[in-house]
């Protein structure tokens, strides 16, 4: 019964205000998601944000090594492979961030003494990479059917030298920015699950960025919902 | 009897203390452990510092060497941090290549140096395009009792303030560098970033400077690095059993 269960769910999210240059405020780049594209992993997803693309695969719940097993919950592992070269310390740090975000939402206690592995491959990097990785990981976990208490999404924002906020920055905008902040938000109450920042900023700017990210996450969650509805609907 | 209860139900034991707004070691929720700093203890290093935050001990040694700058930044030196968590400091670490925690801590320190601009990389330039200083900062944890990131940031800052670089001139005839060990000068430290770590308990309580046990029992941790002007250099919220709202 190995039929082609290749359900493409290519949805275009509504664009912000037209193409580049994006104005300050809340326009995210155009994004797309495709699920169930790999045959080996239990779940897989490819998430595109503008030109940034990440492919995620999830294996689990599966057998775990005795040294790594936790008696009352699932052991979550994240492997992030960069586009070029061998994974380094920066990848390890990002893996830790993604893993902790996933651990906060995955109901690990339903599958004790098992392992859930999320493998992320960077296909192209054009800014907001960590946010794209988080989105791809979430979609892949949903595709694998791993029980979760909420969905999560990643939103990146950049602050340039005069304090203007740009959501979902491109790599050029990230390079020129004074600070780049990435947040992971959950779908139930838009609470902050993880944050990772680069650069100097004041605490009022932090609050502004967080508020903008929470507003933007509405779009991302709506996109997830539409994408999944399209995939599972009969028509 | 209290010791028995602590072994069987560590979280409940802890909650009893938190209800009274204090912790088992007698500290308040917002109180830091006694901090001791010892500067310049390693004579063979160009700069060193030993920091003790309660029981957590981190030593930082800085060695300066020559290097050729990269072609896209010919007037910038390098600062290379490395955090080592040897089996000496805690039974949870094994000998061998650096584990995940050490790599994450190294990346964190590298981010703090980069974001807070603690040293202007141009200050480390000797001769643009030919010779620059590279500062290898090795942070070794001697005793792990929680809050390693704060201790490392502090040790790094103290050691960098202690670094003395000799004067270097390039001899035009031989094109070799001449080091004058008698004339040494301190580094120009532009900002003083300070890291503060918090542990989150049951989504509601925030305690400062968690010990090893507290980190293990907490539902999440959060580290904020600020400089003197009150600007945040880093907001590191990696671990969380659950989420919390900011406002």
Swiss-Prot record, chain A:
Keywords: Cytoplasm, Disease variant, DNA-binding, Exosome, Intellectual disability, Nucleus, Phosphoprotein, rRNA processing. Changing residue 206 to H: In CABAC; strongly decreased interaction with EXOSC3, EXOSC9 and EXOSC10, when assayed in a heterologous system. Its main location: nucleus. It is found in: Nucleus, Nucleolus; Cytoplasm; Nucleus. GO terms for biological process: defense response to virus; DNA deamination; mRNA catabolic process; nuclear mRNA surveillance; poly(A)-dependent snoRNA 3'-end processing; RNA catabolic process; RNA processing; rRNA catabolic process. One of its GO terms (molecular function) is DNA binding. Transmembrane segments: none annotated. The modification Phosphoserine is found at residue 20. Belongs to the RNase PH family. Non-catalytic component of the RNA exosome complex which has 3'->5' exoribonuclease activity and participates in a multitude of cellular RNA processing and degradation events. In the nucleus, the RNA exosome complex is involved in proper maturation of stable RNA species such as rRNA, snRNA and snoRNA, in the elimination of RNA processing by-products and non-coding 'pervasive' transcripts, such as antisense RNA species and promoter-upstream transcripts (PROMPTs), and of mRNAs with processing defects, thereby limiting or excluding their export to the cytoplasm. Homodimer. Component of the RNA exosome core complex (Exo-9), composed of EXOSC1, EXOSC2, EXOSC3, EXOSC4, EXOSC5, EXOSC6, EXOSC7, EXOSC8 and EXOSC9; within the complex interacts with EXOSC3, EXOSC8, and EXOSC9. The catalytically inactive RNA exosome core complex (Exo-9) associates with the catalytic subunit EXOSC10/RRP6. Exo-9 may associate with DIS3 to form the nucleolar exosome complex, or DIS3L to form the cytoplasmic exosome complex. This is Exosome complex component RRP46.
């Amino acid at each position: 019964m190995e039929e082609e269960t290749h359900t493409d769910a290519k949805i275009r999210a509504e664009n912000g205000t037209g193409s580049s240059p994006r104005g300050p405020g809340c326009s995210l780049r155009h994004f797309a998601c495709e699920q169930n594209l790999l045959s080996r992993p239990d779940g897989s997803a490819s998430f595109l944000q503008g030109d940034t693309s990440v492919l995620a695969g999830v294996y689990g719940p599966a057998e775990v090594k005795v040294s790594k097993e936790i008696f009352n919950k699932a052991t979550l592992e994240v492997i992030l492979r960069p586009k070029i070269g061998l994974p380094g310390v920066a990848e390890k740090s990002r893996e830790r961030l993604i893993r902790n975000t996933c651990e906060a939402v995955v109901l690990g206690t339903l599958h004790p003494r098992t392992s859930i592995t999320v493998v992320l491959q960077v296909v192209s990097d054009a800014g907001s990479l960590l946010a794209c990785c988080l989105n791809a990981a979430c979609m892949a976990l949903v595709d694998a059917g791993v029980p979760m208490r909420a969905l999560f999404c990643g939103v990146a924002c950049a602050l340039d030298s005069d304090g203007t906020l740009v959501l979902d920055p491109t790599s050029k905008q990230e390079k020129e920015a004074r600070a780049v902040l990435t947040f992971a938000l959950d779908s139930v109450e838009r609470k902050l699950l993880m944050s990772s920042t680069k650069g100097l900023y004041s605490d009022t700017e932090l609050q502004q960025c967080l508020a903008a990210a929470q507003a933007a996450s509405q779009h991302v969650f709506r996109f997830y919902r539409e994408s999944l509805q399209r995939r599972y609907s009969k028509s | 009897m209290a010791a028995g209860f602590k072994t069987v139900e560590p979280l409940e034991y802890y909650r009893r203390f938190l209800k009274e707004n204090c912790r088992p070691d007698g500290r308040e929720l917002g109180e830091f452990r006694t901090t001791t700093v010892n500067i310049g203890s390693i004579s063979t290093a160009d700069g060193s510092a030993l920091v003790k935050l309660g029981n957590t001990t981190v030593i930082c040694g800085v060695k300066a060497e020559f290097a050729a700058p990269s072609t896209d930044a010919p007037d910038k030196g390098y600062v290379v941090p490395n955090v080592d968590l040897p089996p000496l400091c805690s039974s949870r670490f094994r000998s061998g290549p650096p584990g995940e925690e050490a790599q994450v801590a190294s990346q964190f320190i590298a981010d703090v140096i980069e974001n807070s601009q603690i040293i202007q990389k141009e200050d480390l330039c000797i001769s643009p395009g030919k010779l620059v200083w590279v500062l290898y900062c090795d942070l070794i944890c001697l005793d792990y009792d929680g809050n390693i990131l704060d201790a490392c940031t502090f040790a790094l800052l103290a050691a960098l303030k202690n670094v003395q670089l000799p004067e270097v001139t390039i001899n035009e005839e031989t094109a070799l560098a001449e080091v004058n060990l008698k004339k040494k000068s301190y580094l120009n430290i532009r900002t003083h970033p300070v890291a503060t770590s918090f542990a989150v308990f049951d989504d509601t309580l925030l305690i400062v400077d968690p010990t090893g046990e507290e980190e293990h029992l907490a539902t999440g941790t959060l580290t904020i690095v600020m400089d003197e002007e009150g600007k945040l250099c880093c907001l590191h919220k990696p671990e969380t059993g659950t989420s919390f709202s900011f406002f």
